[in-house]
Amino acid sequence: MGYLSSVIPTDGSPVSGGGLSQNGKFSYGYASSPGKRASMEDFYETRIDSVDGQIIGLFGVFDGHGGAKVAEYVKQNLFSHLLRHPKFISDTKVAIDDAYKSTDSEFLESDSSQNQCGSTASTAVLVGDRLFVANVGDSRAIICRGGNAIAVSKDHKPDQTDERQRIEDAGGFVMWAGTWRVGGVLAVSRAFGDKLLKQYVVVDPEIREEVIDHSLEFLILASDGLWDVVTNEEAVDMTRSIHDPEEAAKKLLQEAYKRESSDNITCVVVRFLHGQGSSGYA
């Protein structure tokens, strides 16, 4: 997606892994592959930490364009900024919004050579019995609640009425160049980086809060290498019967590849484990 550029070469081998939270309340798995591309711009992060005695889960998918530099920077810095935020527990939405914006500002100030490099982000933060999903760009987040596929993020595309209006109000334009693009260049309307288009391509995340209860089964974060060829409902159906989230992530990746996805493919699956112990998720 986005700009075309030479990026990190890869041997084409998929990677996968996973883990379990210390409190046994959630497990996670990931799978990532360059797919049919010769280079890799996707990055992901899976982290379990502790803040004020609470077990915290942090998960993210970052799909770069114009190179891998911004996606790698966001992977390395976004969650560190978030965990250090003084309102991380008391006002998690504000902390997430601030962390997105400060990470973007720091990158733009630190590397003036990467004017046409950017990245999407789709992140999930587990705090107690709350799930916070935030995104910029088109790396989508889906939950399965009561067997139903529910999108908990909105793809930020330049042809959406509200996004196009925002861009034009800021003095920019949207035009068709194979797909709808900001300035005829970029296929997403919100992203990290993209210094030359920053006035129009903002990093304001949309944040959604969900309650972690017994109806919430699992979460999927993935780059558009999956969503270009697999529907939300298909992804949930494929994942629901696979208890091991790493195996579920691998299944999604393999299916996207089989369906001729032309992009890098990265999937993160988080499964919520509703045991017989404490009713809380801290």
Curated annotation (Swiss-Prot):
Binds 2 magnesium or manganese ions per subunit. Mn(2+) 1 binds at residues 63-64. GO terms for molecular function: metal ion binding; protein serine/threonine phosphatase activity. Its EC number is 3.1.3.16. Keywords: Hydrolase, Magnesium, Manganese, Metal-binding, Protein phosphatase. Residues 27-272 form the PPM-type phosphatase domain. SMART domains: PP2Cc (SM00332). It comes from the Eukaryota. It is an enzyme of class 3 (hydrolase). Mn(2+) 2 binds at residues 63, 224, 263. Belongs to the PP2C family. This is Probable protein phosphatase 2C 45. It comes from Oryza sativa subsp. japonica (Rice).
